[in-house]
Amino acid sequence: VGSEMCIRDRWCNTIHTPWNGDYHLNINLQMNHWPAEVTNLSELHLPLIEWTKQQVPSGERTAKAFYNARGWVTHILGNVWEFTAPGEHPSWGATNTSAAWLCEHLYTHYQYTLDKAYLRDVYPTMKGAAQFFVDMLVQDPRTKYLVTAPTTSPENAYKMPNGSVVSICAGSTMDNQILRELFTNT
């Protein structure tokens, strides 16, 4: 069928590509695949689905090494070498809900195909992403809700009352939405 699409993919005319030719998992990769199911081109979703499943072993090592958590995680950058660790800048690199967001694509494919054998195949991947957050969620001291922490709202920063600019937060709205969907689907 082909390969999953990254920001510059095959169309780059240089050896060193912008964004390192990686897969940005904070909307870019996902958005490239949104039309697949709704346009009745489900087979175009398959490379992303296979790539997602291939991230699990590396993501399990990252979950254990960085968070001492079960399951699997991937951050904002991905590539063909199964890179799942945090990126180098906290404003975007600390985003740890990318595996959960990728699992939305696994479930969307099932919703359009209703293929139960396929769902049995991808469910362990979805469950592993959910297990990571079962271990990672913490109680917000003010609201008492379970939230992701540490996390970011990708590529956003916050100005603190003292004027300092920070990127790391707890319970970003994006995380809340992605995790609600992941937990609903698993």
What are these regions (language model features)?
Residues 1, 44-55, 118-133, 182:
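Extended, well-ordered alpha-helical scaffold segments
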Residues 2-7:
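Short, small-residue-biased leader/transition segments that mark boundaries at the very start
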Residues 9, 14-22, 70-119, 134-186:
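The feature captures the catalytic groove of carbohydrate-active enzymes
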Residues 25-72:
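Carboxylate/His-rich catalytic cores and anion/metal-binding grooves
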Residues 28, 41, 45, 98, ...:
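Hydrophobic (often cysteine-bearing) scaffold residues that line and stabilize catalytic clefts
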Residues 31, 101-105, 128:
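Short amphipathic alpha-helical face segments that pack within enzyme cores
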Residues 35, 51-58, 109-112, 129-132, ...:
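Structured segments of extracytoplasmic/periplasmic soluble domains
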